[in-house]
Amino acid sequence: MAQIKITLTKSPIGRKPEQRKTVKALGLGKLNSSVIKEDNAAMRGMVTAISHLVTVEEVK
């Protein structure tokens, strides 16, 4: 299955609590931290909710 690399590019400070919880649930802490996750509907939904805070790349 394909994987995606999610990088936190903007701070969640001052954002809604749901968005901050989503950032933590993805395993992102500090700015420019990255995680590699499986590309599935659940991950895509989480990324869409915080798309203004992260960048997403496909990993082969």
Swiss-Prot record:
GO terms under biological process: translation
Record bears the keyword Ion transport: no
Work out whether the entry's keyword set contains Transcription regulation.
no
Annotated GO molecular function terms are: structural constituent of ribosome
Coiled-coil positions: none
**InterPro entries named among the record's database cross-references:** Ribo_uL30_ferredoxin-like_sf, Ribosomal_uL30_bac-type, Ribosomal_uL30_CS, Ribosomal_uL30_ferredoxin-like
Q: Which UniProt keywords apply?
A: Ribonucleoprotein, Ribosomal protein
The identity of this protein, by name, is Large ribosomal subunit protein uL30
For this protein's source organism, the top of the classification is: Bacteria, Bacillati, Bacillota, Bacilli, Lactobacillales
The gene it comes from is rpmD
